[in-house]
Amino acid sequence: MFEKVKAAIDETGGVLRLDPALVARDWLPPGRRLGLAEEDYDLGERGFVCERWLGSTTHADNRIGPDDEGISYIRTSGERLNLKDAVAAAPALVMGTDYAATHADLGRLAKIFDYGARIPYHIHPPTDQAALVGRNSKDEAYWFPPDVDMGAHPESFYGVHPWIAEGDGAEVLLPYLEAWDDDAILKHAFAYLQVPEEGFLIESGILHAPGTALTIELQEDADTMSMFQALNAGKIISKEMLYKDVSAEDREALHERALMRWVDWKANGDPHFYDNRVLIPRTFKEAEGVDEAWVFYGSPKFSGKRLRLAPGASVVDVERGVHNLLVWRGEGTVAGHAVRGGTPGDDELLIVHDRAVEPVEIVNTGAEDLVLVKFFGPDINPDAPRAGLKR
């Protein structure tokens, strides 16, 4: 595999084209905004295609599905290369010698999620709880792209009311987990509008129910969670989704109460939740026809930028390390490689470390704005701003 990865990098100059990784879910309807043919969303017993994972080395932890579901593939002039295997076989070639010496892999997952109903109120385990089942925590951040249908419920529920966090919050939430028969648990959370071009940073341990806006997400490298909401989109979700990443021992001994260990009560009940976690684009580069902004920030675990170029505009960027990018709108070139938004297979690249730290010219060759999003893993951009509103 090492020689194949080296050949692919040599062939492309370190700018690797990625094929789309489509992921099905069987517990929610799709939003049908991923650009697929109508008949391609329904995968039978596997559910519906609701997500597209980007530059992914993460396996989708579904009840049923192929062994490589969620994994991205590098397109070459010969065979396709599994990105997870490629990084494992040639970490220094992909991530750079110094970074590979301190990081086992890319350590992040980018995705587009596209649901026809609000995602149920759920939580991701903090590091210590995830480790009990051999998994990673799952801090995550969202960006809501503009000019896309927002769906039926473009508002998200986050956290719990402060009085719950300040008291015995477990006793408030546990009855809903035990009964497992409705969605009334949502009354204990705040709802926030999903505003185009904005987003949120949601750390592991925070309860959340993302709304129906098409969302570009950047997160830790994991597919761990526990559902706290039984009724969603008109049906009762299997209670196995509550216990999905709970050890057999904790489930046997503690039952629903085991999940209370996951809840970060201080963060959930933060009276300044919005102020501390909203993500508003932070522009750091402006020139004629050029606008580049941080859209994922506030965490050392990942970061990301949105670049917008007017027709005919170009920019030369130098980054700090390996990253993948999604061309969201328009057409152009990245280091001489033709790209086109909205065309899976022509809209996704991974730029290896040694190429990324050299000048990369990005050119808009089309008649509309070229918009692309860059995704970085842990510790690559220590200068990214903190989350929340500027004070």
Name each model-derived stretch.
Residues 1-168, 232-271, 304:
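Transition-metal
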Residues 110-112, 119, 140-143, 191-192, ...:
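His/acidic/aromatic-lined binding-pocket segments of jelly-roll/cupin-type domains
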Residues 114-118, 126, 134-137, 147-150, ...:
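Ligand-binding loop in jelly-roll beta-barrel domains
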Residues 119-130, 146-150, 300-319, 333, ...:
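Conserved short histidine dyad/triad with adjacent acidic residue
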Residues 157-184, 216-266, 366-391:
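Double-stranded beta-helix
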Residues 189-201, 333-361:
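Short acidic-glycine-tyrosine-enriched beta hairpin
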Residues 256-320:
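Functionally critical, mid-to-C-terminal surface segments that flank or help form catalytic/ligand
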